[in-house]
Amino acid sequence: MGGIIRAFQWAFDPSVEQIGGPTVVPRSNQWSGVLDFFLQSNHDHGSAAHLLTSGGADIVAPATLRGANRLNVAPTFNYSAFFYAGGVFHSALTGAYLELYVEEFDTAGNFVRGIDIGHFEIGYWDGWWLSGSRTWGAGGNSWVIPQNGTVAVTQGFLYRVWLDLHGDIRADGWGVFGGSGAISQAQVRFVQFDWSIDPA
């Protein structure tokens, strides 16, 4: 059995982990299928940030299942991104990536476990410069995250599948004797989850 889910049913936007006053602009609209953010380091002193924004959907394993079964999930998405990292006698980090994560709940709605089952790197740079910078964009349509973990299914249990977008920056700011700066921005447009429950 299986199907296609074409819209997020859940949104998750936890507080951004940050230090040093970077510019942080969460821009997701999960109900329109969009995960989006902008991060920029503080110009005047050291700063860092890690942002997570997620959209999810539920899959219920039928109570009539027999034997050992597994859940297979493949998200399709379009994405675009822009990154900058530069410095003079300093280092800087910029990056963004996607993860596929599944939460399992029993028939009473109690959380059982969480499983990371996929990873897709959009862009990443962590470097030190005598003097230099790197600026680049990334993008593509109809990408799929290959599932690299097994999700054993229990009859009647609920499986909440999340597409997680992560963004990172870290830089030292700019001063008289050099410094560094970083920008990370990415937008992911969710297309669908293709899923199936198959014999293990």
Located regions from the model:
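Mature extracytoplasmic or otherwise solvent-exposed domains
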Residues: M1-A200
